[in-house]
Every structure is written in C-alpha cells, then in structure tokens.
Amino acid sequence: MSSYRGSTRPRKRTREGENYGFRPHRGNSQELLAARIKKDITFLADPRGNSVAADDINYVAMSLSREANDPETISTILDCIQTTAFIIPVKIPHLATLIIRASLRVPLILEKAAAYFCLQYFTNLNSFLYYEAKVDLRMLICMSFALQPGTLKPLFSLLADAISKETKPSVWGDNFLRIILINLPYFIAANNDLGKKDFANEILDQCEIYVRHRKSSITLSNPLSIHDNLSEEELDLLYKQLILSRENDFTFPYISQPWKFFESDFVHIVPVSPSIPEWTFQPTPQQNELPSFKRFFELFNNFEIRTTPDASDVAASIFRDISVDVINHLEFNRVEAAQVLTDLDVYFTYKTFALRGTPVNELPNLDPSESRWKAEDIIVEAVLGELLGSQNTTYKPVYYHSLLIECCRIAPKILAPTFGRVIRLMYTMSSDLPLQTLDRFIDWFSHHLSNFNFHWKWNEWIPDVELDDLHPKKVFMRETITRELILSYYTRISDSLPEELRCLLGEQPSGPNFVYENETHPLYQQSSQIIEALRLHKPLEELDIILQSEEIQNSETSAVRLVMSCAYSLGSRSFSHALNVFEKHLNTLKHFSRKSLDSEIEVVDELFSFWKLQPFNAVMWLDKMLNYSIISITSIIEWLIKQDVTIWSRSYTWSLVNTTFNKLAARLRRSVSNKEDSSLINEANEEKEIVTNLLLSALRALISENAENIWVSHWLNLMLKYVESNFLSVKKDTIEEANEPVQENTSEEQEDTKMQPVDAVDEQPSENNQTAADATNEEK
C-alpha cells in the first residue's frame, strides 16, 4: 500500500521555520514605494515608451498622487525626482511639470517640493556641490508656474551679490557665475512675471563686474590649431551670448515648456512660496584658488553649411550644457547615456532641429523658416569636446570612445554621416592639430573602426600615400593602422585596407625579437643558462659565474643587455608573466640596471629591441618598470634623445612621454602630500626640473639642427609645445595620483591575460591607449 498521503502531507520544517520564528520579510513600505515609482519617473517622457509627453506626464502624475498619502511618502517621491534630475537633466522641465500635475490631486506635493528643492539648493551650495545646486535651481525655475511671483529672484540675487564683490576669479565665483548665467534663459522662458526681463538685466549688470575681472586671468590654447590661440572661454562666451540675447528681447523658443499642455488645469493651483533661509557662504582656501578655464569647443563651424548654433547664439551654450551634463552624470550607464543623447531633439520644442538624418546637402533646400541645426552634430561635438577640448578629461578617454560607439549603434544611419564628416575634417586639419588632440583622435578613430569591422573609405586617401613619410596626413593613416593592429590581427587589418595602403602596415610581427633563442647564436648556451638560473631563483653569484664565461667576455653584447633580454624572454608569455618576473627577480634586475645611467639606457634600448615590431608592449612594460624602480625616468628621456628624429612622429613615443611625465607628476604629488618630509618634496621637484629641462633643451637643439626639414621640425615643435603646455609647470590640483606601491601593484595585476605573439595585445600601455582593455571588449 502506498504511503502517499496527497495534500495532507505536513510541510517539512527547516531551520528558518516555526522552530525559530523566522520568516523572510518584504522590504519596508518606503523601499517598496521607491522601487515602484523609480522606473516611471526615470523613463518619464521617454520617446521609447510614449510618443506623447503630455500623456506620459498625466499617467505618472496620477500614479504618484495615489501613492502620496503622507509627508514621508512624498519625501521618497521627491528624492526619486531629484535623483532623476541629476542624472538626466534634460528632463527637468518634464519632472517639474509632473510635480505640478500631481499636486492637482494632492496639493501637499507642491508645497513640499518647493520647500525641498529650495533647502537642497542652499545645502548643496554650502557643500560646494555646484552641479547639484544648478539642477535644484532649475527645478524651482521650471515649477515657477505654481510659485508666487518674485519667489525665485532672491535665489539669483544672493549669488550675484556674492560675486559682484570679488576682484579676482575663484573656483566658487566661476561656479556661481555658471549657475546664474545658464539658468537665466530657463527663468525667462518659464516665468510669467512681467518684470522678469528687467530682473535679468539687473543680474547681468551685477555679473559684469566679476566677468571683467576674470578676463585678465584667462589663458587658453586652441585644441584644434597650433597657430591660432584666439579661443572663446565658455563662461565669457555665455555672458556675451546673453548680452546679445538682450537685444533680441530674451527670446528662447527652443526651451521646452511641457507645463503649457496643462495650462487650463493649472489655473486652479494655489501658488506657494518656500521660505528662503538666511544664508552666508564661507569658501574654503581651495574654493578661493584660481579656477581652470575651458575653451568652448567647436568643430562644425569649419563647414560651409552651419549645422550647429552660431557661437554668438546662447542656444549653443544651452545645448552644450545639457549634453555635457548627461555625458558626465550618466557615465555609470553608457548605453542609457547614448540613448538620451540620440533623443536630444525630443526634449526641446518641436522643429528646433532639422529632421533626424537629413543629409547636409539637402539643408539649403529647406524652407527659410525651418531649422538647419542637426541634433546629431551637436551631441558628437559635445562628446568630442570633452575628449579633445581639455588637457585632463573628466573620465578615461575610453568612456567617450564607448559613448560614441553606443550612439552609432543606436542610430547608425543618422550618426555615421556625422562621424564621416568629423573624421575627414580632422584628417584635413592634421597638419594644424596639437599633438595631444591628434593622439587622442587617432586613438578614438582606431577604436571606433574596431567596433565596426574596420570599415572605412580608405580609397579617398590613397593619393596621400605618395606624401613624405613624416607628412601629418601620412602619419595620421600610419598611426591609425598601428593602433588597429593592437586591437586585432595583422591579416584582418591587411584585408581591410586597399592594396596601395598596405605599405603602411610594416612588417608582420611573429613574436618577441629574442635573438639568443637561435641555436646558431654564439651566446645561445649562455642565455639558456641565464634563463634557467632565473627560473630556479639561483643566487646572484651563480649568474656572475655564467657572465664571466669567455664567450660573453669576448662578445660585444654587455652583461646588462644579455641578462635583461633573458628576463624579458621569461616574461613575454603574458602581462602577468612580465609582472611576476619583475617582482621575483627585482633585486637581480636592479643589480644590473641601476649600476649607472648608461646601464639604464641599455635596459630601455634592449626592451625596445626585444619588442621591435610591437613597441606599444615596450611602453606598457616601461610603465611597470618605473613603478618597480628598475630604471629611472631620466634614462627614458636620454634614450629618446639618442634615437633617430623620426621617432617623434610615432604614437608610441607620444604615449611614452605622456607616461613618463605622469610618473613625475604623481611622485611630486605624493611627496607634497607628505608634508612632514620636506626632503621628498625637494627631491621630487629637483627630479621634475632636471627631466623637463633635459627634454626641452634636447628638443630645442634638435629643432635647430633640423630646421631645413619641415616635417621633422613640425613633429619636434609639436612635442616641445606639448611638454611646455602640459608638464612645464605642474599644478598640485591637476597632477594625477601616483600608482600604488610595488607590493600592491603586483597583487592587483595578476591577471591571466595572454599577450598575443603576433599583434593583438589585450592591455594597452598608456591612458590614451586603454581602449582594448577598458572597453570590456566592445568588438566581441
């Protein structure tokens, strides 16, 4: 008889059962509420979900009003709205309209929201969180339809009064000025107060004092030209644009005003007025320092047909501000950031931009009343401005690469023509570009091609193969192809190029150039013994015995070169192997390398000989060898100076110089942070001065020697200007952090990444070349 008892079988008790009185519980009500409403608020007015923004706002507002039962629940809702405003600021007008719409059923929401954002505004100012304060003020401005007249004026006046008393620029002063100027157009567009334009004029007059004082401190270089230093600084330009807008009666028709969809309903709202707290601002010494100035980056002003707002139009600054805020504050999700950017036109008024994907050659045929601005050009210009427009990027360059890649994946037919125009423009301008701009652009271009099967219309550039080998256009092609080889395999890159351009590929690498592995080499036996001694960790005395052999003594090869080449061979299987060799044989390697400066130069020279056909590997290894103090920074500069002058036109040289000087800067910063030890500061300063002067004097001498060779002089001058502008005077607040100590570095770097013997390397050598590793293998 079966023992089965059907549904009457008792449930088995577990450790978490009745015996212990434990039951998994659901989260508290506020956590559940946040989870329910977060998605609705985040995707508010998103064109992917609802093509009609008014319907979406109405739907979400009804949902929120049902949830808003008490002050605690309303606070949770406002926290979600503020978070969304921070990461997707382009939706601020829609979020403000959502609050007003929800308050029709729950008036307490509006009262709480006005008080909440007003309090957050002053709190963030006191905490020096200027971006957050800018967003909070804009939220209040876009809610002004439901605020009492004059409520917002003190929020502007307090900042304007503070900066009007300043006689020199400061970090806090520039940020106050930005908050005021960039929010004034929104204030005028959203406010129904009859005196709003007079108030805007008063604020601009107050700001004029500070703007005039800061002009004398502005020093800028043009990232798109080595000849033209005339550049418009962002805040100075924004002020000029608003002054010009005054002549047009402050008209900003492109700013979205979604609250107008509900004007007939909003007449029933009782306006509120949040209390303005007594506020005093006390800046720290860091906030009183001289600010960093940023040039307004323009690319599309060089085309015959203008597809972006003119620099004199405040729309240029408004679109750039919104785009850059999305780029810099949605960085944790580049796919979503790319989606918001490609939908940029949706968040401004209808017909602000030409239809997506409209060919440039068709723009002149449009009706004169129709816009010729292309949203895709605006976002590409904004991303490239962040990548190319300043010496120090906010994030690693690979983030901006990946963002452009995602934009192109989302809307390839729309963005591909824009990318093509930019690439051709930069190629044409290559002889005028500063070194850093050229290097970063080539880095992006090669990375971008690697994600789209390396397809490019190379045939357009075939005639330029006949140019001099050092001509910037030919260098542009050659170094792009070199970077592609790092991201793929030789045969694949070769197949993607027309026959005429394959001469730029160079010789196909078959692996490291370890000359002693050939059995016919006179030192084959000794090199094998050295490798075995290193592998078995034999004492230094036994190595010395091997080096005393007659074959080595009679050879032209020095002991330093032989030992280092054998060590390189041991570490050539992967990057992990290289780090292990440096760590385990550190004392042995230092014994040979640090005998003299000449020995260190030999170590560097042997490394580049070992990676003869893959010099980026050598740059990557040198970065780690500097961490382990196997060589000094001076030895790298000395080695560079002794090479053929054509080396200054190679991108691996640019990366090597950048890596070397970043190490100097990091050491200086680390020594400055250790205030108790003044000797460290003096030593770091002395090292920086010696190395910088060594390179600068050598470059000037080489320029003088090669004055008759136009393109050799061109590359030497580019490097000279690059070093002078980036490293001649290192500011404490712009120096990059030093690498971790050797012990920590080695533990972090134990990754089993294979170093391809042909041409594919998973990890690239410098900050500007992190595309393969940090992009999480975009191609795959």
Curated annotation (Swiss-Prot):
GO biological process, one term: nuclear polyadenylation-dependent CUT catabolic process
Domain of life of the native organism: Eukaryota
Signal peptide: none
Main localization category: cytoplasm
Phosphoserine found at: 29
SMART domains listed in its UniProt record: MIF4G
Family annotation (Pfam families): MIF4G, MIF4G_like, MIF4G_like_2
Keyword terms of this UniProt record: Cytoplasm, mRNA processing, mRNA splicing, mRNA transport, Nucleus, Phosphoprotein, RNA-binding, Transport
Record-annotated MIF4G domain positions: 34-249
InterPro entries: ARM-type_fold, CBP80, MIF4G-like_typ-1, MIF4G-like_typ-2, MIF4G-like_typ-3
GO molecular function, one term: RNA 7-methylguanosine cap binding
Any one of the GO CC terms: nucleus
Compartments reported by the entry: Cytoplasm, Perinuclear region; Nucleus
Region: Disordered, residue numbers: 1-25, 738-780
Annotated family: Belongs to the NCBP1 family.
Purpose of the protein: Component of the CBC complex, which binds cotranscriptionally to the 5'-cap of pre-mRNAs and is involved in maturation, export and degradation of nuclear mRNAs.
Subunit note: Component of the nuclear cap-binding complex (CBC), a heterodimer composed of cbc1 and cbc2 that interacts with capped RNAs.
Protein's UniProt name: Nuclear cap-binding protein subunit 1
Native species: Schizosaccharomyces pombe (strain 972 / ATCC 24843) (Fission yeast)
